[in-house]
């Protein structure tokens, strides 16, 4: 009986997401699905983001094909104000019916950027006399106008002329996603996803591809406090902070065969600040013929490969309630007791994991848990 009363109470309130911590917009219409929980991961490159959204409905017969592949929007209310939200926009790559009981039905949606579709198409193709920018533009552009997909991407590179035309680039029995990720890694490029909220409907998202640290900008909360959890604190804070250091490769050597000049070409890069008593640990590779046509190109590729190794030499991990943080954002940590742990320093978010539950009242939350677990 309590379940039916709770369901009736929810429906009597108009099944609305107004003023809730989490808000979910789908093509089904406003409030057909009520966000219950958000779990997700965002990162630089590696697909951009994946969100898992548990949603409640009074309808246990929503056809899953009505949402699969469709654009959706998730909003998370932040500490900056009731109308200040962290927004994610993406496509539903998987929809599941989790069960129904006592007037409630639960669905789970997996939300990803349009890049996820590139995992579903495999091809073999030869790109001739094109730069990496031109190749990626060509692959992404091929998805324009296909169903509900409207790919958006933007380049934030220092100098497009840095990326010379590649005489021959082969995609061989690779998915478009694996091919693009490989090209980006070879050229020292990385990306993240930016989101723009829609007005009453799902918004849009853009893949931003960059090659320099100047592309990282401060977010809405540019200065973040290190502080213990406190119910009276009005500002989101970081409450745990850890540093790790790892012994990494400290030199890169590349070699390639220039079949036009009929000679071998070499390039290398080495760090100047080795750890005390460290031996040289070189990554030597022969990636194939005509990888670079001159020394400048070779040195750039070698330095990119070394930078990728060194990135993980010193990393910081934190836990907290800062809902505005996103990949590629800069922030300054304040209030930490240990200067050696980064207090007062600038950081860039590489990866972030979210876990949020909606602000249901106690009786409703208890009824949902009893009905659906």
Protein language model annotation of sequence segments:
Residues 1-373:
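Amphipathic alpha-helical and helix-coil boundary elements used as assembly
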């Amino acid at each position: 009986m309590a379940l039916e009363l709770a369901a009736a109470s929810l429906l009597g309130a108009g099944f609305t997401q107004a003023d809730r911590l989490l808000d979910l917009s789908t093509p089904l219409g406003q409030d057909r699905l009520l966000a219950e929980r958000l779990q997700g991961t965002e990162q630089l490159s590696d697909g951009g983001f994946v969100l898992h959204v548990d949603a409640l409905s009074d309808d246990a017969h929503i056809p899953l094909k009505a949402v699969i592949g469709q654009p959706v929007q998730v909003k998370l209310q932040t500490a900056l104000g009731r109308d200040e939200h962290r927004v994610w926009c993406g496509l539903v790559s998987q929809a599941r019916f989790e069960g129904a009981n006592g007037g409630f039905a639960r669905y789970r949606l997996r939300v990803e950027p349009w890049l996820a579709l590139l995992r579903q198409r495999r091809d073999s193709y030869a790109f001739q006399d094109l730069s990496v920018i031109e190749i990626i533009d060509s692959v992404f552009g091929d998805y324009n106008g296909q169903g509900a997909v409207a790919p958006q991407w933007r380049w934030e590179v220092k100098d497009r002329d840095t990326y010379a035309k590649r005489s021959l680039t082969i995609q061989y029995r690779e998915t478009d996603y694996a091919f693009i990720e490989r090209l980006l890694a070879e050229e020292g490029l990385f990306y993240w996803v930016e989101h723009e909220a829609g007005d009453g409907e799902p918004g849009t998202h853009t893949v931003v591809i960059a090659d320099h640290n100047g592309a990282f900008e401060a977010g809405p909360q540019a200065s973040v406090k290190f502080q213990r959890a406190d119910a009276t604190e009005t500002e989101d804070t970081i409450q745990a902070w850890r540093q790790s250091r790892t012994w990494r490769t400290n030199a890169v050597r590349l070699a390639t065969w220039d079949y036009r000049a009929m000679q071998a070409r070499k390039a290398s890069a080495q760090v100047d600040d080795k750890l005390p008593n460290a031996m040289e640990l070189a990554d030597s590779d022969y990636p194939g013929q005509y990888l670079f046509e001159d020394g400048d190109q070779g040195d750039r590729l070698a330095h990119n490969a070394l930078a990728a190794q060194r990135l993980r030499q010193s990393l910081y991990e934190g836990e907290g309630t800062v809902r505005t943080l996103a990949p590629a954002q800069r922030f300054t940590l304040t209030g930490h007791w240990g200067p050696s742990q980064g207090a007062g320093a600038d950081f860039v978010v590489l990866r972030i994991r979210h876990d949020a539950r909606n602000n249901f009242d106690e009786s409703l939350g208890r009824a949902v848990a009893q009905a659906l677990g």
